[in-house]
């Protein structure tokens, strides 16, 4: 960890980095439709599933739920990455787990990761949708009663939606920001 990851520049990033100290800019937003529904029962389980850059909105929702609302509802976060170095905020989520017994963080790495092993970081090798199914949903009493919030690459979203559909989860319980399409 540490350092920067080289990524292709986006329109906004290019604009921001072209500014000079003292330049005035106007910012608005964020605008989007990825948010928790109002009036959910306090006991309804929330399952967050993220991958790649999907960490940012997931973290925002989870910080609000636990640091602002101090929610007591059952919540889990299943995050998939290629390697530990591509999984930010792991320590932060473990700290929330310690403070809130109703929260579980689960890290899925695509393959065994020597760096994670050396650091003693707990993870499950595999794709996040398979890890979620094998380690939780296949034995869940009522997966159709949970609310699922996802943000990540299109292939991840499609795999999770198919799995949830196969489990009989109604589409209104599946919320996602498909930023890759």
Residue locations for each model-derived region?
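Ferredoxin-reductase
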Residues: 1-23, 81-83, 108-112
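Short, Lys/Arg- and Gly-enriched loop/turn segments at beta-strand edges
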Residues: 32-40
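Phosphate- and divalent-cation-binding pockets in alpha/beta enzyme and binding domains
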Residues: 35, 57-60, 159-160
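Conserved S-adenosyl-L-methionine
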Residues: 42-44, 67-75
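Conserved beta-strand elements of the Class I
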Residues: 45-49, 147-149
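Histidine-anchored nucleotide/phosphate-binding helix
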Residues: 57-69
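Reductase modules of NAD(P)H-dependent flavoproteins
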Residues: 73-181
């Amino acid at each position: 960890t540490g350092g920067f990851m080289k990524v292709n520049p986006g329109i906004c990033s290019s604009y921001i980095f072209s500014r000079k100290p003292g330049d005035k800019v106007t910012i608005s937003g964020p605008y989007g439709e990825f948010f928790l529904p109002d009036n959910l029962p306090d006991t309804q389980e929330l399952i967050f599933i993220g991958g790649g850059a999907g960490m940012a909105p997931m973290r925002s929702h989870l910080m609000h739920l636990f640091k602002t609302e101090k929610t007591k509802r059952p919540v889990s976060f299943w995050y998939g990455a290629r390697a530990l170095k591509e999984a930010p905020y792991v320590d932060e989520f473990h700290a929330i787990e310690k403070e809130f017994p109703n929260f579980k963080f689960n890290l899925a790495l695509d393959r065994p990761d020597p760096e994670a092993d050396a650091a003693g970081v707990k993870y499950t090798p595999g794709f996040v949708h398979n890890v979620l199914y094998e380690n939780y949903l296949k034995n869940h009493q009522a997966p159709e009663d949970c609310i699922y919030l996802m943000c990540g690459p299109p292939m991840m979203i499609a795999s999770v939606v198919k799995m949830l559909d196969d489990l009989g989860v109604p589409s209104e319980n599946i919320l996602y920001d498909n930023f890759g399409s």
